[in-house]
């Protein structure tokens, strides 16, 4: 057993339920499973069968078919990450605002881990739309998928992976100097932060957008956006609009991007 293996005890489902499920909480159900293909796919399947997944949390110790944006895989090591999906009812919110939900999730993840890591604020933040970066490495990612009347938000947060266990451009809490990251505490804090940000999103609270802009590493940067159709656009990221889209200054004209992969250029 390696030192990292010793830092990978199982999650305590009962404790998480005791902390997060109850009167006044937005979370109605929480389950921890040893292994699944994809927590997002599992909640989407429940929604398709007619189940009410609003406020449902599904956490997996290991994912064998995790997915990132645009159909890419999400690497996973057993008990080395926090891998979870939640269901959010969205039909009572204007569809134009749905794009901000995944941005809110990224902000919640960032807020849950930023106090733990000794990284200057200028090196920790959000890459549009919702990647959590620290020292240039990807620490966490979000995948939002619609299954009306719900959106399923998936979170993958790297906790104790070694460099060889993650993609070259990724990092983990352990490698950022968190000596013994406690996944139970982090998961609990993350879900509390996520609940608070969902409430802000649902209420159209302007503080959500203000906080996101303050923590954005993309706004003000020269970027290349790789669009889903295979084209690229290069410009200065100026803002995020009220639909969660990235607004670029491209040679003096504004180009609005709703989906794509951002590369920060030097």
UniProtKB/Swiss-Prot annotation:
Domain BPL/LPL catalytic: 14-202
pH dependence: Optimum pH is 7.5-8.0.
InterPro entries: aa-tRNA-synth_II/BPL/LPL, Biotin_CoA_COase_ligase, BPL_C, BPL_LPL_catalytic
Residues noted as binding biotin in the record, renumbered to the chain: 38-39, 63, 67, 138
Coiled coil segments of this chain: none
Impact noted for substituting residue 138 to S: Loss of activity
Activity regulation info: Binding of biotin and ATP significantly increases the thermal stability of BirA and leads to the formation of a high affinity holoenzyme complex.
Assembly description: Monomer in solution. Forms dimers under specific crystallization conditions.
Family: Belongs to the biotin--protein ligase family.
Note from the entry: Identified as a drug target. Inhibited by Bio-AMS, an acylsulfamide bisubstrate inhibitor, and analogs. Bio-AMS displays potent subnanomolar enzyme inhibition and antitubercular activity against multidrug resistant and extensively drug resistant Mtb strains.
Domain note: Belongs to monofunctional group I BPL as it lacks the N-terminal helix-turn-helix (HTH) DNA-binding domain.
Protein name in UniProt: Biotin--[acetyl-CoA-carboxylase] ligase
Species annotation: Mycobacterium tuberculosis (strain ATCC 25618 / H37Rv)
Lineage: Bacteria, Bacillati, Actinomycetota, Actinomycetes, Mycobacteriales
Gene this chain is encoded by: birA
